[in-house]
Amino acid sequence: RLGKSKVKAVRKEEDLSEELTDEGFGSIVVIANVFGFKQVIPLAEGDNVIGRRCVGTVINTPIETGDMSMDRRHCIINVKRNKAGKLVYTLRDAPSLTGTFLHNEVLGDKDRVRIEDGAIMTLGATSIILKAGK
């Protein structure tokens, strides 16, 4: 099985459009790299625990990747609506071993940072981009 990737291949019929989900809470776009393929993962209201997909790990936003520098519970994006009805996104570290980076700045273990549409986050060697909902 030498050279066989543990990460599944992208199927031709798989829809990789970055359109928002029906719920409209936005999504994260995982940038393709040597560890994995492009993925568009919808976000839900409340805490979205993001990390490396692994059997037995309980997270609601798993990323399929071979990137071992990404923790199984790496960071959390909280999605909620403010009083005006606008979606507010807050990023925090889980905490992770390698740290969570927002625009190449590392977050501390206690940091809570508001993020906007197009925010670039780095988890281990994997980069993700926030696509905000309406």
Label the predicted regions.
Residues 1-66, 78-88, 132-134:
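Intrinsically disordered, low-complexity acidic Ser/Thr-rich regulatory segments
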Residues 121-125:
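Conserved metal-binding segment of the jelly-roll/cupin
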Residues 1, 60, 74-76, 80-120:
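Forkhead-associated
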Residues 67-72:
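Short coil-to-beta-strand transition motifs
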Residues 6, 38, 106-107, 127:
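Short, solvent-exposed loop/turn motifs
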Residues 54, 93-95, 106, 127, ...:
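A short beta-strand motif that forms part of the nucleic acid-binding face
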